[in-house]
C-alpha cells in the first residue's frame, strides 16, 4: 500500500462515516480499498457495520450522480476534452457507450460489477438523458451488495485489510460472470418482448 494512500486513509479515518463517503466521492483511491478500510474500522469498533454500508452507498452514489450530470450537461465533447482530469479514459467511455446502446438502461446496474465500465457507465446514461430517478435506483441497488462485500472482507482481514486487492478476485470474478449473464438475459428478454409487440 502506497504511503500517499495510507496517509489519505488515515485522514479519512478521523472523519468516521463521513470519511468513507468522501473517500468514495473523490475516487482518488479505488472503492474496494476505501470500503475494506471501513471494514477494518468496524473490526476495531471505531464505527458500526450498518453505518459503514450506508456511508459507502451514499458516497458511491453521489460520485456516480456527479459523473451522470457531467454526461448529461457536458456531453461527449466535454468529456473528450476534460475527461483525463477526472481520471476517465476515452476508451472506457467508448466501451460504456457501446454497452449502453446495445443493452439499454439495465446495464447501469449490471455493469457496476465489471471493471473498466463500472464507473464510466454513468456517462452514457447521462448523455442519453436516462430518467434521473431510474438511474439513482439502479445505481443504489448495485452499490449496496458491492459495499457489503468489501466492508465484510475488511472485517475478516482485520489489520491485513490492505490484502483485499489480492483476494478480491476470488469474490468479484463470480459476481462479474453473474453480471454478464444478467446483461445477456436482459438483452434476450428485451428483444423477445419487442418481437411479441410487433
Swiss-Prot record:
So what family is this one in?
Belongs to the DedA family.
What the protein does comes down to: Flippase that catalyzes the transport of undecaprenyl phosphate (UndP) across the cytoplasmic membrane, from the external side to the cytoplasmic side. Is involved in UndP recycling during peptidoglycan synthesis.
Q: What is this protein called?
A: Undecaprenyl phosphate transporter A
**Cited Pfam families:** VTT_dom
Report which residue ranges the record marks as coiled coil: none
Q: What happens when the gene is disrupted?
A: Deletion of the gene increases sensitivity to the amphomycin derivative MX2401, which binds UndP in the outer leaflet of the cytoplasmic membrane and prevents its recycling. Deletion of the gene sensitizes B.subtilis to reduced levels of UndP synthesis. The double mutant uptA-ykoX exhibits increased sensitivity to the amphomycin derivative MX2401, but has no discernible growth or morphological defects.
Q: What is its main location?
A: membrane
Q: Which residues cross the membrane?
A: 15-35, 47-67, 107-127, 135-155, 169-189
Query: What topology does it adopt in the membrane?
Result: Multi-pass membrane protein
Q: Which UniProt keywords apply?
A: Cell membrane, Cell wall biogenesis/degradation, Membrane, Transmembrane, Transmembrane helix, Transport
Briefly describe its induction.
Expression is regulated by the ECF sigma factor SigM.
Give the signal peptide, or none: none
Q: Which cellular components does GO assign to this protein?
A: plasma membrane
Which GO BP terms, alphabetically? Answer: cell wall organization
Where is the protein situated, by its record's location annotation?
Answer: Cell membrane
Amino acid at each position: 500500500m502506497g504511503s500517499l494512500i495510507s496517509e489519505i486513509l488515515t485522514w479519512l479515518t478521523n472523519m468516521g462515516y463521513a470519511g468513507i463517503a468522501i473517500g468514495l466521492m473523490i475516487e482518488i483511491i479505488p472503492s474496494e480499498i476505501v470500503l475494506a478500510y471501513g471494514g477494518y474500522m468496524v473490526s476495531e469498533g471505531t464505527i458500526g457495520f450498518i453505518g459503514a454500508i450506508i456511508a459507502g452507498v451514499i458516497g458511491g452514489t453521489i460520485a456516480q450522480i456527479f459523473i451522470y450530470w457531467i454526461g448529461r450537461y457536458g456531453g461527449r465533447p466535454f468529456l473528450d476534452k476534460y475527461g483525463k482530469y477526472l481520471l476517465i479514459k476515452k476508451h472506457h467511455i467508448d466501451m460504456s457507450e457501446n454497452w449502453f446502446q446495445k443493452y439499454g438502461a439495465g446495464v447501469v446496474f449490471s455493469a457496476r460489477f465489471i471493471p473498466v465500465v463500472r464507473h464510466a457507465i454513468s456517462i452514457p446514461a447521462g448523455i442519453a438523458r436516462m430518467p434521473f430517478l431510474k438511474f439513482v435506483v439502479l445505481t443504489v441497488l448495485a452499490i449496496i451488495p458491492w459495499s457489503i462485500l468489501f466492508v465484510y472482507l475488511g472485517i475478516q482481514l482485520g489489520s491485513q485489510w490492505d490484502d483485499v486487492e489480492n483476494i478480491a478476485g476470488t469474490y468479484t470474478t463470480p459476481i462479474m460472470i453473474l453480471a454478464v449473464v444478467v446483461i445477456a438475459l436482459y438483452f434476450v428478454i428485451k428483444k423477445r418482448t419487442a418481437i411479441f409487440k410487433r
